[in-house]
């Protein structure tokens, strides 16, 4: 997305803003500083991004989110730390924390990053003259951060591949599926956390696929679960396949991310290898009560054993504990795909399964639990074409 002009980032539309709820609150109530007409005096001790403050100025009014949003993935970026702590060792934590602060923490979001301005990771700046919006504009908020993979897939920006049917036909926005409760880390009903007898706690999520799968395709397509939609493939495969196995098309993956600090400018930067197109089915690394599938789509994540080598050697000694081909939910769903053309589009087709020959030698051990050891054999008498 194109960056905003410097003046656009900070211009407050006084007339428009004063007519809103937040416009009836004094600037100093949120930003502190001094009540003075002199610019320099007024800006003394001012907090430019008050929703970042530990005092939690937003939660003084939005009390229902206090103590909840602070534990959400948007606020904590816990997914990063789950991976770093799993692959690292305690004695390397301080070094990794420094690297995290330099390179990863920009993805952290506060209330203001979604509801009044663009995220800091894309340069920031007000949406609309400091006017707060209850539902953020999708392409300037959600896909500003989740753009290189999810956004491009969903909006159909990957050349040669259509956008997701939910956007193309239904013009659905992210929040049509991902509710405010989910985005704020706020369960909306008991079953979102208490899903099975052995799962009776409500700890903050360790990563985005931790806990209950939400939303699910079946939330809007319940007949596919009940097996009453007269689609034989849904009945035959049942819960063995995630929906994306049949209804996703080619998506993007990327390889190692490497970080460093520029000797010239002193500023941190990162670089990733080239993005490439993939569609690979593997064994489900997140198999659970709510994700019972044997097979699911996998995406290569941008990490490598030496991602943080600028800061020290062997900082991730347990790198092989987690797969580099990870559980994926591509946002490019189609009714008809190459996989739905016939049974043997998948059965007996080695091109679409993650097999050991598709891995770099140094990645084999890390992905041993997601590699498909033997692909499903071709069937002699395919079931009738489900697309007909």
Q: Which residues does each predicted region cover?
A:
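C-type cytochrome heme-c attachment and multiheme electron-transfer modules
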Residues: 1-122, 131-388
